[in-house]
Amino acid sequence: MIKWPWKAQEITQNEDWPWDNALAIPLLVNLTAQEQARLIALAERFLQQKRLVALQGFELDSLKSARIALIFCLPILELGIEWLDGFHEVLIYPAPFVVDDEWEDDIGLVHSQRVVQSGQSWQQGPIILNWLDIQDSFDASGFNLIIHEVAHKLDMRNGDRASGIPFIPLRDVAGWEHDLHAAMNNIQDEIDLVGESAASIDAYAATDPAECFAVLSEYFFSAPELFAPRFPALWQRFCQFYRQDPSQRLRVSAAEGDYGEESEH
């Protein structure tokens, strides 16, 4: 159990969101105009349904809130807003935060430790984030704190705890589990060879299946070129679950860019 310091400032509702500016980040640049319009519609509903709460002196404004909402809704662009019904509040610290973490080990002993967290989510609880890492989530780099925590929430729709297997048809579970564990083993092999800091995929993905699903969801949306060719079978399973193909978006965007350059000559 984590004990949180509740010193909060809640954002007020604002109907005049700066969507054009909010969309102007590398993570969202490859969306089509139609996808952007649907993403904005979802983000507007998100801001109506969820409370964004600024903690420890952090200040939210309309642009920050709009970008947060857009990133929250990117994973559920084709799933629907109801996939985010497992929480009602988003708590935002200015930076990674220290909390008192208590847990019980296998023999029943309770341990307590102060730990630094970037984010946190759990069943039917709020999502906890920090602004420094949210800002780093705007890039197409493979790191995205918001998508990571959303993936945990989507994962937990399939049960009380995150397992790495989201809500998919029962016939697909065994194949998903096989491909996910194969990816974990592959990532661990690379870590053993070159070390955590030099690994091409965040080493956190090798810790357990739930974290592997969350980390690879970050890469799925923000660095598909690192995910798709390395784990093609698992990539296809992610495409089927999220009902999106960011790698295809990237190819189309690159082709359009090449065409535009040729037209200028």
Curated annotation (Swiss-Prot):
Key words, A-Z: Aminopeptidase, Cytoplasm, Hydrolase, Metal-binding, Metalloprotease, Protease, Zinc
- Domain of life of the organism encoding this protein: Bacteria
Instruction: Tell me the GO BP annotations in alphabetical order.
Output: proteolysis
Q: Which CDD domains match?
A: Peptidase_M90_mtfA
Q: Name one GO molecular function term.
A: metallopeptidase activity
Its needed co-factors are: Zn(2+)
SUPFAM superfamilies, per this entry?
A: Metalloproteases ('zincins'), catalytic domain
One term under GO cellular component: cytosol
* Assembly and binders: Interacts with Mlc.
Q: Which PANTHER family match?
A: MTFA PEPTIDASE, PROTEIN MTFA
Family, per entry: Belongs to the MtfA family.
What does it do?
Answer: Involved in the modulation of the activity of the glucose-phosphotransferase system (glucose-PTS). Interacts with the transcriptional repressor Mlc, preventing its interaction with DNA and leading to the modulation of expression of genes regulated by Mlc, including ptsG, which encodes the PTS system glucose-specific EIICB component. Shows zinc-dependent metallopeptidase activity.
Protein name (record): Mlc titration factor A
- Source organism phylogeny: Bacteria, Pseudomonadati, Pseudomonadota, Gammaproteobacteria, Enterobacterales
Q: Which gene encodes it?
A: mtfA
